[in-house]
């Protein structure tokens, strides 16, 4: 194509460059028109939304109360200093088998004087830190009382299979995501628990209901072994409210101590207290016991994305 023909057709380098610029401006204008003011881009589809629930599977062990043949001495017992919240009966660290260890240095917490954080929420006495503005609790006297745990041998069967003493099976809990983003299992709203009048997950199973009034299976323990990823910016927490005994360990260290036979009591742990490393995976081990009539309450609330790490062997299938 000679220069004269290019000139006639308007096809020179300057015209070509102008056409490209105009096309780019047109595209940008169309994009601007299609995105309303204040609109934001869609989230990355490769990032999945948080799950609507998490399922945790652990082991429940059934016991017979102390007044019957082959009954366990720690179940349906009244502690020497009465029904109350007791601490200190167990070691600060899990044993080599991943289970809590009895040390027999328990004390009764004075009513109304729990250890609390600066917001007034109950925390484990072992995590008390005055530099954070925590409020110190009080012991009810100087005596030792382990909250109705007879000795190390009796406690040794709480979270271990013991032929003739307990029967065990797997048990799963579903924690549903709430509006604030935390995951909750609450026996006061769970349909099956409401129908049963409380947290009685093995009604008519294993040793069965013992009779009496109310005729519920009150005498059992439950353990969970889970993992999570620590997020230093996530304000991560774990809370339990219920009865009777509950102990929680993170990275093998006790962070909740709710020993004793008592009505519903609450403690929480804020994970930024624990010196964890951002992005690392840690264990959370949970141990619960229901030891006495007439109530059984159980509430877990957490914003941790927990998942089951392991399920110990059991003596019975769960249907």
Give residue spans per PLM region:
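N-terminal secretory signal peptides that target proteins for export/translocation
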Residues: 1-18
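Intrinsically disordered, low-complexity segments
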Residues: 5, 16, 32-35, 40
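N-terminal regions of proteins, emphasizing targeting and processing segments when present
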Residues: 9-12, 25, 37
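Hydrophobic alpha-helical segments and their boundary regions
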Residues: 13-17, 23, 241
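Bacterial N-terminal signal peptides
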Residues: 23-34
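Acidic/polar, compositionally biased interaction segments
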Residues: 40-319
């Amino acid at each position: 194509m000679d220069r004269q023909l290019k000139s006639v057709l308007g096809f020179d380098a300057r015209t070509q460059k102008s056409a490209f610029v105009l096309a780019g401006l047109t595209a940008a204008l169309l994009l601007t028109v299609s995105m309303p003011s204040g609109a934001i881009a869609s989230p990355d589809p490769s990032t999945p939304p948080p799950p609507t629930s998490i399922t945790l599977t652990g082991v429940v062990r059934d016991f017979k109360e102390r007044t019957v043949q082959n009954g366990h001495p720690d179940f349906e017992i009244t502690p020497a200093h009465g029904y109350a919240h007791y601490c200190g009966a167990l070691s600060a660290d899990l044993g080599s088998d991943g289970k809590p260890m009895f040390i027999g240095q328990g004390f009764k917490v004075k009513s109304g004087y729990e250890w609390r954080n600066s917001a007034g929420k109950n925390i484990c006495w072992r995590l008390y830190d005055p530099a954070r503005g925590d409020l110190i609790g009080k012991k009810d006297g100087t005596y030792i009382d382990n909250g109705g745990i007879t000795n190390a041998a009796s406690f040794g069967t709480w979270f271990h299979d013991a032929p003739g003493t307990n029967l065990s099976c797997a048990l799963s809990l579903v924690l549903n995501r709430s509006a604030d983003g935390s995951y909750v299992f609450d026996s006061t709203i769970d349909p099956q628990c409401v129908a049963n009048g409380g947290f009685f997950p093995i009604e008519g199973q294993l040793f069965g209901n013992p009779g009496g009034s109310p005729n519920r299976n009150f005498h059992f323990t439950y353990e969970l072994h889970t993992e999570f990823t620590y997020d230093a910016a996530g304000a991560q927490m774990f809370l339990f409210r219920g009865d009777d005994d509950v102990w929680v360990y993170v990275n093998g260290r006790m962070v909740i101590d709710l020993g004793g036979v008592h009505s519903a009591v609450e403690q929480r742990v804020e994970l930024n207290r624990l010196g964890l490393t951002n992005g690392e995976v840690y264990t959370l081990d949970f141990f619960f016991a229901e030891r006495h009539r007439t109530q059984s309450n159980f509430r877990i609330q957490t914003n941790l994305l927990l998942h089951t790490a392991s399920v110990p062997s059991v003596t019975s299938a769960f249907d």
